[in-house]
């Protein structure tokens, strides 16, 4: 049920009252990051992020719910079976549909989608980057055409922060430009400097426009600089100087070799504050996730587990399975005996292959639940091995297996 604006103001007022009462009695709902264990043989760390909507153990993988839904997966499956601790929404897509008016009347994205755990929203910079043929970038912001109906829109740092206030995510990303790969040095530097100026405007806007729903939102600025070490260093130093609740690394996993990505991540993590969470945007394969955890990354997201699932690729601890292959047609063993989620032991490989062959959407749903369950299991295991002190040995063993084609 959508709320009237009067009802929404009433709700916001009382939620703010309860928030203040909680602080009086020692319950601070502002985001907090605690490091619990530092790995002795890598830069991996075990920690927890505390938000108004719950705690997030780190390292963590965040399923992507671009338009307010993780494709093919119910919220109950996400929370109870997959055990996602935080999900993503996207400012660009949510702005176009359903729009900020609907979201505000619903009481924010949490209430609109029925999700009571933390949410992070991307600023839409990557989506605008992907619309290279229909957008123009200037100092004021980005003019682009909707992929839905071709209508023209303008994103500026101020308008994007306003949209993210209306969405109401716990963690909101600063507006930035994601550069392509390869990218000329001159363009990468100019883009990075503009991203820094946009960040200053984001910070100013948020300081003058408080949260709408009675709980705090934490801004994460984004390090850019393409694959140039000097630019990444300059950007990381700028981002570190802001003193934000957390920091992100963007502009990677856009086509550069994995070794280059790891080099940039290692460089930037050595500059960003160690007492704040580090979020690597848009990454990646299971092996990418483990390697970046070893470099000091705490948070990652990617559409890969669900996108690949819809194409019949399953990730497992022993390697990847293309369930469409004929070899699985009469394999009546469970999808995965490891049982990351209930679907893994409820259905057989032969049945799942049949669903894909028959183009039944249920097959894509089952594969999506499995892959997300595996990704969340993988980071849970990473946390356990950091705690146990053998993360590096376990990581090297897992990476060798993860790239195997079964």
Regions found by a protein language model. Name each.
Residues 1-8, 14:
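N-terminal amphipathic/hydrophobic targeting modules at extreme N-termini
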Residues 20-27:
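Short, positively charged and aromatic/hydrophobic N-terminal segments
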Residues 31-212, 326-329:
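Non-catalytic, usually N-terminal nucleic-acid engagement modules in DNA/RNA processing proteins
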Residues 31-48, 56-62, 71-72, 176-182, ...:
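C-terminal extensions of enzymes
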Residues 54, 87, 122, 164, ...:
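Conserved, mostly hydrophobic/aromatic
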Residues 181-184, 189, 246-252, 361-364:
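Glycine- and acidic
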Residues 193, 205, 209, 217-335:
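Glycine-rich phosphate/ribose-binding loops and adjacent secondary-structure elements
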